Amino acid sequence: MSKGTVALAMSGGVDSSVSAYILKERGYDVIGIYMDLWRDEREEYCNKSAAEDARRVAEKLDIPFHVINIEKKFKNNVIDYFIDEYLSGRTPNPCVACNKTIKFEAFFNAAKEFGADFMATGHYCKIEERNGRKVIVKAEDDKKDQTYMMYNLKQYQLERTIMPCGEYKKDHIREIAESIGLDVYNKKDSQEICFIPDNDHGGFIKRNYKRKISEGNFVDKEGNIIGKHKGIIYYTIGQRKGLGIALGKPAYVIDINPITNEVVIGEEEDIFRTELIAKDVNFIPFDKLEKPMELEAKVRYSAKPSKATIIPLENNKVKVVFQNKQRAITKGQSVVFYDKDILAGGGIIEGIV
C-alpha cells in the first residue's frame, strides 16, 4: 500500500536521484520534477544536460517526470535580490532566498498542483518531531549538513516535506547510486552559486544589470582616500585579496558605504566583532522568542557554531551577542541559531554593533 505521493525536486545530481530511489523503496509514489530556473544572456545555466540527467534517472527508476518553468519567479526573488544586495553594499545569500521563495514556496505549491501529498528534496537535513512540533535536525554527514540554509521554513512546510539524504553519509549515497546503476553516481558536487557556474559574481552582475557599475574610493577609517576601487559589487567584509592597493601592510575591507560609494579599509583586528542585529527572524521549535536565550550561532555556512545570547527586539529583529569575537560579520548574510543538533532559527544580518 502506498504511503502517499511525493513530488521530488530533481536537479540531475546524485542526491536528488538517490532520494527518488529511497522514497520509492519506502513505499511512496514518486513524481520527479525538474525546475527550469534561469538562462543567462551568455549561456543556458539551467542546461539541457542537467534536465536530461534527471529525466534519465526518472526513466531508470520508472517514475513520472516533468519540467516546470519558474524562471520569472526565480528572477524576481533570487536574481534581482542578489544584484540589489551587492549594489547596496551587502553580501547576499541566494541559497537562503531560493529555499524560501522557490523550493519551499513555488515548488511546494507546484507539488500540490501535481496532486502530491508531500514534497521532497535532496538536501542534507533531517526533519523530526519533538515536543509536538516539526524541527530540522543536523544531517548525519556533518560535512554536508545544509541546515544553515533552512531556517526560514514554517511548520506547514515541514509537515509535508521529506529529506531522505539527511540520514546518510554522502559516500553512502554515491554507493547506493552506483549499486542501482545510476550513471550520476560520480557526478561532481556543485561548489559555486548555481546560476554563476564560473563563480564570477561581478561579471554576472555586469551582464545582468543594465547600468554602469561606478568606480569609487578606498578610504581608511578616518575617511582619507587611499586608492580607487572598481565598484562596490566586487568587495565583501573581510576581503584581503584582489584589492589592488599597496599600503605596506595587510589591508582588509572593514565596511562598504553604498551612499558615498566608498570601501573602507582597515586592519585584520577591525573585522572581529561580537554583536549584531538581525532582521526577518524565523524560529522553528517555537513561534516567537519571548526572552533572551542562550544558543549557538554562526554567521556563515562554513563557520563553526559559537555560544551566543539571542535577545528579542521589536519588528521581528534580534540582537545577537557572541561570547567570542567573530570574524567578518557581514550585512546581508544569515546568522543561524542552533540548540545542540536542532536548527533553532535565523535571520538576515542587518547591522554590526
Curated annotation (Swiss-Prot):
The keyword Protease does not apply. Its EC number is 2.8.1.13. The record marks 123, 333 as: Interaction with tRNA. InterPro entries: MnmA-like, MnmA-like_C, MnmA-like_central, MnmA-like_central_sf, Rossmann-like_a/b/a_fold. It catalyses: S-sulfanyl-L-cysteinyl-[protein] + uridine(34) in tRNA + AH2 + ATP = 2-thiouridine(34) in tRNA + L-cysteinyl-[protein] + A + AMP + diphosphate + H(+). This is tRNA-specific 2-thiouridylase MnmA 2. GO terms for biological process: tRNA wobble position uridine thiolation. One of its GO terms (cellular component) is cytoplasm. Belongs to the MnmA/TRMU family. ATP binds at residues 9-16, 35, 122. It comes from the Bacteria. HAMAP family: tRNA_thiouridyl_MnmA. It comes from Clostridium botulinum (strain Langeland / NCTC 10281 / Type F). NCBIfam families: PRK00143.1, trmU. Keywords: ATP-binding, Cytoplasm, Disulfide bond, Nucleotide-binding, RNA-binding, Transferase, tRNA processing, tRNA-binding. It is found in: Cytoplasm. Residues 144-146, 300-301 are annotated as: Interaction with tRNA. Catalyzes the 2-thiolation of uridine at the wobble position (U34) of tRNA, leading to the formation of s(2)U34. Its main location: cytoplasm. One of its GO terms (molecular function) is tRNA binding. Disulfide bonds join 98-194. The active site is at 98 (nucleophile), 194 (cysteine persulfide intermediate).
